[in-house]
Amino acid sequence: MVSYCYRFKDINGNVIYVGKTVDINKRMAQHFGGKGHLDKSCYKSVARIEYQKYKTESDALIYETYYITKYSPKYNKLGQSRDKPTIQLEEKDWKTYQVLKNQVEKGEASWGCLTYILIIALIYAIFQMIA
């Protein structure tokens, strides 16, 4: 089953959280739709969300653990470990998690990544109430 490793970066480009999921859209909706387990200050600090796609959940778990120990993100409890990676995994390209596909002209309205995530979270919550 396809899985993802994702990371939150702050305005300075620092990795502040690393996680993994099998459904990136649902997970972002949970994080930013009020069901996230992280401190609110983490979500307020997010300036960029990046992800990598893996063929298996086991691969994503290995990379998640590797990146947490490599970057020691502020909001990962595992990142507080004193151990550092002793293996070197292949670095993959991080893709930016976003919804906008076209450049928006100045003055035009646009829907950004986090707005879209909140909309997904709202729709998901409505379906949960109906079901």
Feature annotation, model-predicted:
Residues M1-V18, V22-N102:
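Structure-specific nucleic-acid interaction/processing domains
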Residues L100-A131:
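C-terminal single-pass membrane-anchor helix
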